Amino acid sequence: MELLRTITYQPAASTKMCEQALGKGCGADSKKKRPPQPPEESQPPQSQAQVPPAAAHHHHHHSHSGPEISRIIVDPTTGKRYCRGKVLGKGGFAKCYEMTDLTNNKVYAAKIIPHSRVAKPHQREKIDKEIELHRILHHKHVVQFYHYFEDKENIYILLEYCSRRSMAHILKARKVLTEPEVRYYLRQIVSGLKYLHEQEILHRDLKLGNFFINEAMELKVGDFGLAARLEPLEHRRRTICGTPNYLSPEVLNKQGHGCESDIWALGCVMYTMLLGRPPFETTNLKETYRCIREARYTMPSSLLAPAKHLIASMLSKNPEDRPSLDDIIRHDFFLQGFTPDRLSSSCCHTVPDFHLSSPAKNFFKKAAAALFGGKKDKARYIDTHNRVSKEDEDIYKLRHDLKKTSITQQPSKHRTDEELQPPTTTVARSGTPAVENKQQIGDAIRMIVRGTLGSCSSSSECLEDSTMGSVADTVARVLRGCLENMPEADCIPKEQLSTSFQWVTKWVDYSNKYGFGYQLSDHTVGVLFNNGAHMSLLPDKKTVHYYAELGQCSVFPATDAPEQFISQVTVLKYFSHYMEENLMDGGDLPSVTDIRRPRLYLLQWLKSDKALMMLFNDGTFQVNFYHDHTKIIICSQNEEYLLTYINEDRISTTFRLTTLLMSGCSLELKNRMEYALNMLLQRCN
């Protein structure tokens, strides 16, 4: 067997700093504790890379005894001086140290390899190959390679510094992680790994100790000591390499290492994060390998069904049966659960609390009391993690319909998760609530509109205390309150309002490459990009609005975009041209622009097998049903929620939601409202 890796990480023991070697501090302000320096604008995000050495033998370790590495290190080529700090980790060939550039105080993780450790040609080749592969990589979720140099004693590789060490350290402190945390970390691992595979590079040693966490709790894939170029099947190396517990059956059977082998290791990583131990851990290596070859492991009942299914698919014995990285992100495990936009550093040692309070939430509790007071015994709910009765399956099978979601959710500093539980939906019930109660519900609906949406004069003002989650929450509460309390009726009410509002007339899903594009009824074209940013081309085709976060808008001419936005503006124009040339409008609503209302931009979208859901910054909510081209649009105007229904003949009718609450509506419309609510709850969750 060749090269079975084991890396041992040292606790970051306190070491005496550079002052001893220099007689003074490393930087201008030596008395202060020096935090990691923020990166320059042009550089990738700064983070840690206590990257272990190129390779370590499994059966024996060489001693690291040898000449003490100097505290001050000089690059012979450039003359730059560095100060060596504490040990971050060690392995068979090298140790990894914190190292500071004395010219600018920038901190690196430096892998220092004594020439004596790589004296044999094949050992030196491994180091050279690692440098060659790693130095060309540039990705947010891959440890950044900065520089390497040699002196008479050592080889020095300078890498991105990650102050919060590795996932192995976090799991050691935490024992197990919550599902939202696992989704948070896995999304980033998949992002980095997808980039590597697109560069035709296999990592071949994915494990918790090789996922590094920076100051901002961002994950970076590191340690390319065993990485290799992807070869055609017939030319693949038959080397057995990697961490014993994470080796795949095909690697153990010497059939070669492909992308599927990295997916297998990812399955082991997910299992370990959730349960605190690897899936194939046994008392001896021989038994471990037998279990791996047979893909035999236990799946505790404590795991929820989506997590079990995703792990089982990644740990399929046959490599061809494993999901692709895109399949993984579209799996129910990600679609049906909350994923935080960021994690607090306290998550390194403490279980996070995702039940955060916010001004919007406190308001909802008061405003929605009338919607939910004393109703729970009268309404039935469906728990989508449990069995659903047969008569409801056709309407409420959304959980199984969901094949594809939008992109990762748009960053939001205030995003909260109200309830970590499966989404629920309402089933129609008989009985008519008292008139006073309906009036109370109508008042509550108006109160929520007035309190959150009706008084806004700009999108930034609308969302100052609000978030993507609370926009969805508001619409869901209002729609659910209406559905729970309106009477049964055979037809749509007579009311027909003449109103003006924006809605989506055309859309294009190009999320496999760029993002989701749409055209509004005023001919504004918008794209929600795969990175969560949003860009709009106004009807004049000359002005671009760019939203990096909720409520934060940059405006610039389409013909003179800032350099960093040029490629996105090109994509935006492509979407605009495509929809103009190839798609027809989806209904008969007049195109009216109200300059007093904030500009619409898309917050979220979701596709199931039956429908497309879109949620906008001002609370406008649209669901398009594929099979009959019917549409539901909910928006707020003048402290009132309005619902527009576009039927199969593309004829639209608009009602006040309070009218539907009092009069009821046809089963045709009610079923669509319930399905729309189910999609919204699914996305909220």
Swiss-Prot record:
InterPro entries linked to this entry: Kinase-like_dom_sf, PLK2_STKc, POLO_box_1, POLO_box_2, POLO_box_dom, POLO_box_dom_sf, Prot_kinase_dom, Protein_kinase_ATP_BS
UniProt GO molecular function: ATP binding; ATP-dependent protein binding; protein serine kinase activity; protein serine/threonine kinase activity
Gene3D superfamilies: Phosphorylase Kinase, domain 1, POLO box domain, Transferase(Phosphotransferase) domain 1
Chief location bin: cytoplasm
Region of interest (Disordered), ranges: 24-71, 406-433
Sorted UniProt keywords: ATP-binding, Cell projection, Cytoplasm, Cytoskeleton, Kinase, Nucleotide-binding, Phosphoprotein, Repeat, Serine/threonine-protein kinase, Transferase, Tumor suppressor
Entry EC no(s): 2.7.11.21
Catalytic site positions: 205 (proton acceptor)
Pfam families: Pkinase, POLO_box
Catalytic activity: L-seryl-[protein] + ATP = O-phospho-L-seryl-[protein] + ADP + H(+); L-threonyl-[protein] + ATP = O-phospho-L-threonyl-[protein] + ADP + H(+)
Location in or out of the cell: Cytoplasm, Cytoskeleton, Microtubule organizing center, Centrosome, Centriole; Cell projection, Dendrite
Modifications the protein undergoes after translation, according to the UniProt entry: Catalytic activity is enhanced by phosphorylation of Thr-239.
Sequence ranges assigned to domain POLO box in this UniProt record: 503-581, 601-685
GO cellular component: centriole; centrosome; chromatin; cytoplasm; dendrite; kinetochore; nucleus; spindle pole
PTM annotation (Phosphothreonine): residues: 239
Subunit organization: Interacts with NSF; causing NSF dissociation from GRIA2. Interacts with CIB1.
Domain text: The POLO box domains act as phosphopeptide-binding module that recognizes and binds serine-[phosphothreonine/phosphoserine]-(proline/X) motifs. PLK2 recognizes and binds docking proteins that are already phosphorylated on these motifs, and then phosphorylates them.
Protein name: Serine/threonine-protein kinase PLK2
Species annotation: Pongo abelii (Sumatran orangutan)
